[in-house]
Amino acid sequence: MTPSTGSPTPSTGSSRPGVPTGLTVHRAGDRFRTATRWLDSRHSFSAGAHYDPANTHFGLLLLHNEDVVVPGRGYDEHPHRDTEIVTWVLDGELEHRDSGSGELRRVPAGGVQWLGAGRGVRHSEHATPSGDGVRFVQMWVVPDEPGGDPGHAVRDVAGPLAAGEPVVLASGLARHADSTVLPLRQSMAALTVVRLGPGAVTGLPAAPFVHAFVARGSATPEVPERPGPDVPELGAGDAARIVDDGGRRLTAGRDGAEILVWEMHSGLGAGP
């Protein structure tokens, strides 16, 4: 897969030798795809049968899938370990059950779920049998340390999201330690969602790695080094990956935008 780029010429000022700074656009159509009778999944990084050695992760983000699942179907029980899993539900309702509590939990649209796999957990995820199925974005990050007890939590943020301000969904950053956001056992990462009206502007965090995914609508990133018509617009399913160049802004298009933003203050090894 070859990403389309909306980035300036790589800067020589990166603190990671060989890693270009600036903004790179990865288009929705460049994602890997897995399609079955019950699932349509788009993978931003290598996943399952799809492998690109140049696109295995970004920062601490190991997986970023957008899944559409038909009613009553889904992922049967399967194992995870040493992974922090965050799921954002866009449409419909997701049913989740794990081996920790055995309790069936439902996550509605506008809801976020965290599953800390710890030393090992088994879980299942299905669309509710009624309705039109479910669409969600699932994201994995590496934890600070392996092992530990599995954990699970759900939060509905549909109300705060409607206000148009950024809502922190899950975080391990010290500045969020006393807040009501879902925990993340990765002290260098946080996930935020913002729903913007037409023409509204939001700032992106100043962090070594920023991943901004447009889940709905469209948005145009601030690219001072490429002013005018050459600035790339991000449509639904597109993502901006930004390295060592934080503090940019995004302006929503005429239909508004819903954007998921990862702020990461570390990466895996020396690479992106």
Give, region by region, the residue ranges found by the protein language model.
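Jelly-roll (double-stranded beta-helix
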Residues: 1-272
